[in-house]
Each structure stands twice: as C-alpha cells, then as structure tokens.
Swiss-Prot record:
It comes from Thiobacillus denitrificans (strain ATCC 25259 / T1). The keyword Protease does not apply. Belongs to the transaldolase family. Type 2 subfamily. One of its GO terms (biological process) is pentose-phosphate shunt. It is found in: Cytoplasm. PANTHER family: TRANSALDOLASE (PTHR10683:SF31). This is Transaldolase.
Length: 359
C-alpha cells in the first residue's frame, strides 16, 4: 500500500501543487490520483510559467493564438483554462464521491487585482463562468481587499481558495469572512451546499523570514528556535479553525448544509536544505485539512514518510514557542504582512513574465 494513501485515511487530503499539459496528457496526474491518493490540484502563475517553458504541448496552440488573439491575457486564458477544465474533469468522480468535499482544482485571479475588491469579485465571477466546472476553486489573495471580495463571493456561492496567508490573524480574518458570507447567503434563502472554500496558509516562507530575524538576534536561545515558527503557527491556526467551525455561529449554518473552511498547508517544500524534507508534512497531518505538495515533496512522502496524526499534539509547546518569539522581539504579524505583500509582488512578477512569454 502506498504510504501517501495513509494520509487520507487520517483525514487529510493531499493535493498536488503543480499542473501542466504534460501531467494531463502522459497520465502522470491520473496515476497520482489512483496510486498516491492525490485528490486536488493547485496552480499559480509561477507554475504555469514553468509549464509553458518546459512543455512542448503548448506550441501549436500558442502559435495559433498569436495569429488569432491580439489580447495577451486572453491568450493566456485560452492556454490555461483547457488544462484547468481537464484537471477538473479528471477529479470530478472524486468530487462527486466525496459529496463536494474534495476533488478541486484552483485557478488564480490576476495578481494585479490583489488590492481591488470589486475588480477581484468581477474577475472571479468571470473565471467561474468561463471554466464552468463545479469543482473549481477561484484563488483570491488574503489581502484585506481580497478578504472582502471573498466574503462577497461566498455569498454568491462561488468556490474560493484564499491564498497568501502567513499568520493566525490572517487566517482568522478569512474564517470570519466566510461565516459572514454564508450568513448573508443563508438570509437570502440560497443553498449553502453551493459554497466551498479553503484557506491556504504558507509555511516555508514564514520560517525563511523568521529564521533571518533569529539569526540577526544571534543568541543561542534565538538560534534554537530556527525552523519552528511555521509549524507552531499552523498548529495554533488549526485550533482557531476548530473554535470557529465547532462554535455556535457556524453550527446553525452547518445544519443548513454549510461546509467548514478547511485549512490548506501551502509552501510545503523546504527551502532550507538543513531541515527535514517533510518538516511541513508529518507534523501537520490531521483531520479536516489539506496539504498541497510539490512533486519533490510528494515523492519524499511516498519514499520515507511516516504518517501519524500529529496536528493536535504539542499544542501547548507550539503556544509557548510563539510566546518566545514575541519575547525575543520577533513580530510574527509584521512578518506576515511583509510576506503577503512580497507574495503578491512575486505572483505579479511571474504573471507579467508569463504574459511576456506568451506575447
């Protein structure tokens, strides 16, 4: 039995943080779904930029689009959306078997809209209609403007993956927006089963940023905390999830068919080679969560993973570690704000490079 399938038996979904025409056409994604238990896909402009640069399967379509379509963003969509639809179709049986709890594929709104609430709502609605698949998640950044857009999209019954979250406070703001959006949807008499959302908490980037601050402090005490911020934060974010979605405000919505907003662990490939390659996988296995893995991390889990449920263990230790960061002067909320801003800029840079590649 493949080790990776043990993870799903423990209540966590494994998604692939990659999508390309190669994966679809050579059967690799279908094989991961069948053999590894992969049950969803995430994508972003950086992933599509790499796919376009490395796959031969886009050349004919790109040549045709350069002749027929003057708008570069529409060329991009004409290349990407067929892949998104094909991945959605591949995962549709799983989506249906899970009654809509799993089997999703993510597609991002244009990064230039990260600080534009109405623009994000309009773009998300357009992409939702354009892809026309029930198991699409439209990715919206977790900026304050993006969170406001997410609340509106939830009210409209559009599935959303809120991305670029780097702190417990940012995750909690997203949970609260989801509950408010569902409340408005319930008040209108709409079907609450038609709204699905996840909250993507980015991990390795947090440790990279916090480790740099700890190194700057330079004490033995600070250096002993390197590589611990992200996992501690994730464990406490999960406690916030439980408090929100086991609490009275959500219980009434759940009785009408509303689904809780699962946390999704993102940025789970280690960036520091000194750290264990499953640092952001094994300690965070737990029910009602998702981990989206790059190919290399999925291969590591398959090869030597030891999945046991650890997410609800050592919570007091995680809380003590976060208190220690504060005592040392490491402001995790300030780090999160910087990382979110940098993440938006990184995706915008990748998106513009992708458009230049297509143009």
């Amino acid at each position: 039995m493949n080790i990776t399938k043990d993870v799903s038996r423990l209540g966590q979904s494994l998604w692939l943080d990659n999508l390309s025409r190669d994966l679809l056409r050579d059967g690799a994604l279908a094989k991961m779904i069948a053999e590894d238990g992969v049950s969803g896909v995430t994508s972003n402009p950086s992933i599509f930029q790499n796919a376009l640069a490395t796959s031969p399967h886009y050349a004919d379509d790109l040549a045709r689009l350069r002749r027929e379509e003057a708008d570069v963003e529409r060329r991009y969509e004409a290349l990407v959306i067929p892949d998104i639809r094909d991945a959605c179709d591949l995962l549709l049986p799983l989506f249906e078997r899970s009654a809509g709890n799993d089997g999703y594929v993510s597609l991002e709104v244009a990064p230039r809209l990260a600080y534009d609430t109405s623009g994000t709502v309009d773009e998300a609605r357009r992409l939702w209609s354009l892809v026309d698949r029930p198991n699409l998640l439209v990715k919206v950044p977790g900026t304050p403007e993006g969170v406001d857009a997410f609340e509106t999209l939830t009210q409209l019954g559009i599935n959303v993956n809120v991305t670029l979250l780097f702190s417990i406070a940012q995750a909690q703001a997203v949970f609260d927006a989801y509950v408010r959006g569902l409340g408005k949807r319930a008040a209108s008499g709409a079907d609450l089963r038609r709204a699905k959302a996840v909250a993507s908490l980015f991990l390795s980037r947090v440790d990279t940023a916090v480790d740099a601050e700890l190194a700057g402090i330079g004490t033995q005490e600070s250096l002993s905390l390197r590589g611990k911020a992200a996992v501690a934060m994730a464990k406490l974010a999960y406690q916030a999830y439980l408090e929100t979605f086991r609490g009275p405000a959500f219980t009434a919505l759940a009785a009408r068919g509303a689904r809780p907003q699962f946390l999704l662990w993102a940025s789970t490939g280690v960036k520091n080679p000194d750290y264990h390659d499953l640092l952001y996988v094994e300690p965070l296995i737990g029910r009602e969560t998702i981990n989206t893995l790059p190919d290399k991390t999925l291969a590591a889990l398959r090869d030597h993973g030891q999945p046991v449920p650890q997410l609800e263990q050592a919570v007091d230790e995680a809380s003590a570690q976060l208190a220690e960061f504060a005592r040392l002067g490491v402001d995790l909320d300030a780090v999160a704000a910087r990382l979110q801003d940098a993440g938006v800029k990184q995706f915008e840079t990748s998106y513009q490079a992708l458009l230049a590649q297509i143009g």
